[in-house]
């Protein structure tokens, strides 16, 4: 039998908003890199306050990231009476064994926003470890699951492990909540992710609901601004979330801001500061239409791109531009760069 897991929250950060029940959600990022480096790609662990049943939002990073974070003491897994299922088994790499066991015990679901490699790479490579005794469920909108079946788990690019019972695919509908754990449900939204050689690309956003506290958390995959999209889709999300923000039931948004301000022709289906602020101004107007003052919203920024020849840290430039534009627009939003290996509870 496996030993019970106790996770210590090293480098702990608590974000609290007056009026909210504490610890409705836990967020822990395994990777927030927007490229072009292949390390630390998009993967965010989401759970309730107990951090027992964990959903991996995207799977660009997984097992190797867990090993690294355990090894570096950013994630401590204690209370082990046995590392493996087998007696008299010598464990050469304890961090590897703990990461394997943590994934096996706690992370049963991968919620995929879209099928670009930087969002699925880790989950695909690691799927060989799952096994029919501990299968994982891969959840997504229909176009995500169709792409994974046809173009990834197809016995060409990667074995069809669903046929071997290693993984189960689950399609979720954009018009209804679906329970993924005992306490958390999701409401999916399709979003635009630009176009490539004339073909429109789609991604996803998910509104998480804690069914016990009736609190919410909004998380985006890669997303294109409505202002440049062929069909505006983000507005539907802002409309759905505005009443929740007005009621102080939603305080945090995980959203990308890939680069400092650049021309629209170079965005390739991503946000930059001016477009993010513009979208949030629309959201704030919708919230204020309920006759309330906009509560301060926390935007956790992810998918920042890097370049070896940049003279300034892109995160610093992005934050500076966001704060300047936000101030000019009287936007009630706090921007934070999502930190890998750090717990957020709200």
Swiss-Prot record:
<dbReference type="InterPro" id="IPR024225">
    <property type="entry name" value="cAMP-PdiesteraseII_CS"/>
</dbReference>
<comment type="similarity">
    <text>Belongs to the cyclic nucleotide phosphodiesterase class-II family.</text>
</comment>
<dbReference type="InterPro" id="IPR000396">
    <property type="entry name" value="Pdiesterase2"/>
</dbReference>
<keyword id="KW-0114">cAMP</keyword>
<dbReference type="InterPro" id="IPR036866">
    <property type="entry name" value="RibonucZ/Hydroxyglut_hydro"/>
</dbReference>
<dbReference type="GO" id="GO:0005634">
    <property type="term" value="C:nucleus"/>
</dbReference>
<protein>
    <recommendedName>
        <fullName>3',5'-cyclic-nucleotide phosphodiesterase</fullName>
        <ecNumber>3.1.4.17</ecNumber>
    </recommendedName>
</protein>
<dbReference type="GO" id="GO:0004115">
    <property type="term" value="F:3',5'-cyclic-AMP phosphodiesterase activity"/>
</dbReference>
<dbReference type="GO" id="GO:1902660">
    <property type="term" value="P:negative regulation of glucose mediated signaling pathway"/>
</dbReference>
<keyword id="KW-0378">Hydrolase</keyword>
<dbReference type="GO" id="GO:0005829">
    <property type="term" value="C:cytosol"/>
</dbReference>
<dbReference type="GO" id="GO:0006198">
    <property type="term" value="P:cAMP catabolic process"/>
</dbReference>
<dbReference type="GO" id="GO:0106072">
    <property type="term" value="P:negative regulation of adenylate cyclase-activating G protein-coupled receptor signaling pathway"/>
</dbReference>
<dbReference type="GO" id="GO:0047555">
    <property type="term" value="F:3',5'-cyclic-GMP phosphodiesterase activity"/>
</dbReference>
<dbReference type="Pfam" id="PF02112">
    <property type="entry name" value="PDEase_II"/>
</dbReference>
<dbReference type="GO" id="GO:0051447">
    <property type="term" value="P:negative regulation of meiotic cell cycle"/>
</dbReference>
<dbReference type="GO" id="GO:0110034">
    <property type="term" value="P:negative regulation of adenylate cyclase-activating glucose-activated G protein-coupled receptor signaling pathway"/>
</dbReference>
């Amino acid at each position: 039998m496996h030993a019970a897991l106790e996770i210590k929250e090293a480098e702990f950060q608590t974000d609290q908003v007056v009026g909210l029940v504490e610890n409705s959600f836990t967020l822990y990022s395994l990777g927030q890199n927007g490229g072009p480096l292949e390390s630390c790609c998009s993967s965010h662990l989401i759970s309730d306050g107990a951090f027992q049943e964990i959903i991996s939002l995207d799977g660009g990073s997984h097992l190797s990231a867990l090993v690294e974070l355990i090894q570096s003491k950013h994630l401590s897994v204690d209370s082990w009476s046995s590392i493996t299922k087998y007696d008299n088994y010598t464990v050469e790499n304890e961090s590897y064994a703990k990461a394997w066991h943590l994934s096996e015990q706690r992370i049963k679901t991968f919620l995929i926003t879209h099928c670009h490699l930087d969002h699925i790479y880790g989950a695909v490579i690691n799927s060989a470890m799952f096994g029919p005794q501990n299968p994982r469920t891969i959840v997504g909108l229909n176009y995500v699951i169709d792409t994974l079946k046809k173009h990834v788990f197809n016995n060409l690019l990667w074995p069809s492990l669903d046929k071997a019972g290693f993984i189960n695919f689950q399609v979720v509908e954009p018009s209804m909540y679906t329970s993924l754990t005992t306490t958390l449900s999701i409401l999916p939204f399709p979003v635009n992710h630009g176009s490539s050689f004339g073909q429109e690309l789609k991604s996803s956003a998910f509104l998480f609901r804690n069914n016990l506290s009736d609190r919410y958390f909004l998380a985006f995959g890669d997303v294109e601004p409505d202002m440049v999209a062929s069909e505006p889709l983000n507005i539907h999300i802002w409309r759905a979330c505005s009443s929740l923000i007005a009621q102080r039931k939603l305080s945090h948004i995980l959203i990308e801001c890939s680069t400092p301000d650049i021309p629209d022709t170079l965005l390739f289906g991503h946000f930059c500061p001016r477009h993010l602020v513009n979208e949030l101004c629309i959201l704030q107007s919708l919230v204020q239409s309920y006759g309330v003052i906009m509560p301060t919203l926390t935007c956790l920024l992810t998918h920042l791109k890097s370049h070896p020849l940049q003279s300034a840290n892109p995160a610093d430039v992005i934050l500076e531009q966001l704060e300047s534009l936000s101030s000019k627009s009287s936007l009630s939003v706090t921007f934070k760069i999502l930190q890998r290996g750090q717990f957020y509870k709200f």
